[in-house]
Curated annotation (Swiss-Prot):
Bound cofactor: record note: Binds 2 iron ions per subunit.
The protein, known as: Alternative oxidase, mitochondrial
Binding site for Fe cation 1: E163, E202, H205, E310
Positions of transmembrane segments: 156-176, 222-242
UniProt source species: Gelasinospora sp. (strain S23)
Length: 362
């Protein structure tokens, strides 16, 4: 008796990929804005939804929806822990973060501040923010509200673009200080680790938002161009004046705190209903990285965590700009002397304008 011939239509790997795609189509449905594919997961908690599969919103056809960077399965490795584990935040610390501005005192400060304002203007254009959605230009240092709120998709466009660039300064500064330490045959006194950790933290912000959406060709092109220009500009500026560069980054992080504060306000005011929904699920990688407790895993909670991180970068860079760039140790990684005359700086997130040199070095 002849055995019928069986045609293999796909490999085991393709079958696994197909199954993941089918699962994702059962949990999400799409929507599209400016080349950005958004996939926000909701889970049923209400009685009338308990029999239905989780729904969500994206911007492309369902069959194309997939994890933008799925974890690669290996025979032995279960997961890769973060190189710099997050120390975590208390609710009190996160709530106490406020938008603040350090007034320029020198020509270098003024130059750094004006460059940040130009970058803010360019970012508004690149991310499609309309005039009525921009904050009060008469109070650019503290304004966190606008005539018209952004949508969830617009916020994700802005977050992706900003965080793709925000991870550049720390890496550039850390790299140059590493090379400087090798050339001088001297220790760096703790600056390199803090700068690289800052860059890593910004990248984790980006990867978290990337779990919610996938950039299109236009966004990828904008990111490529912006990163190329920004990296080289930071490289040259840090060679010329590290002090002004750190001040620039401090002002840049001020803008980040303003941005996330505005997002929190719009969530609280009900302008972002998808993110206010109790069924909304933030990415699991965010829960693990920030060690977010049960009951504190909403989108607003996630933004609180990220804003606190940005507040740290704000305080750290303003402080580093106040120090002797070649000789002073990094005050945020050193143990301080106890007793009379000894000082221990408070959390940099709570020092918006940074510490003066006399407060941490003497």
């Amino acid at each position: 008796m002849n055995t019928p011939k069986v045609n293999i239509l796909y490999s085991p790997g393709q079958a696994a990929q197909l199954s993941r795609t089918l699962i994702s189509t059962c949990h999400t449905r799409p929507f599209l804005l400016g080349g950005l594919r958004v996939a926000t997961s909701l889970h049923p908690t209400q009685t009338n939804l308990s029999s239905s599969p989780p729904r969500g919103f994206t911007t492309t056809s369902v069959v194309r929806l997939k994890d933008f960077f799925p974890a690669k399965e290996t025979a032995y490795i279960r997961q890769t822990p973060p190189a710099w584990p997050h120390h975590g935040w208390t609710e009190e610390e996160m709530i106490s973060v406020v938008p603040e501005h350090r007034k320029p005192e020198t020509v270098g400060d003024w130059l750094a501040w004006k460059l940040v304002r130009i970058c803010r203007w360019g970012t508004d254009i690149a991310t499609g923010i309309r005039p009525e959605q921009q904050v009060d230009k008469n109070h650019p240092t503290t304004a966190t509200s606008a005539d018209k709120p952004l949508t969830e998709a617009q916020w994700l466009v802005r977050f992706i673009f900003l965080e793709s660039i925000a991870g550049v300064p720390g890496m550039v500064a850390g790299m140059l200080r590493h090379l400087h330490s090798l050339r001088r045959l001297k220790r760096d006194n703790g600056w390199i680790e803090t700068l690289l950790e800052e860059s890593y933290n910004e990248r984790m912000h980006l990867l978290t938002f990337m779990k919610m959406c996938e950039p299109g060709l236009l966004m990828k092109t904008l990111i490529l161009g912006a990163q190329g220009v920004f990296f080289n500009a930071m490289f040259l500026s840090y060679l010329v004046s590290p002090k002004i560069t750190h001040r620039f980054v401090g002002y840049l992080e001020e803008e980040a705190v303003h941005t996330y504060t505005r997002c929190i306000r719009e969530i609280e005011e009900g302008h972002l209903p998808k993110w206010s929904d109790e069924r909304f699920e933030i990415p699991e990688m965010a829960v693990r990285y920030w060690r977010m407790p049960e009951g504190k895993r909403t989108m607003k909670d996630l933004i609180y965590y990220i804003r606190a991180d940005e507040a740290v970068h704000r305080g750290v860079n303003h402080t580093l700009s106040n120090l002797d760039q070649k000789e002073d140790p990094n005050p945020f990684v050193n143990d301080y002397k106890e007793g009379e005359g000894g000082r221990r700086p408070v959390n940099p997130a709570l020092k918006p304008t940074g510490f003066e040199r006399a407060e941490v070095i003497r």
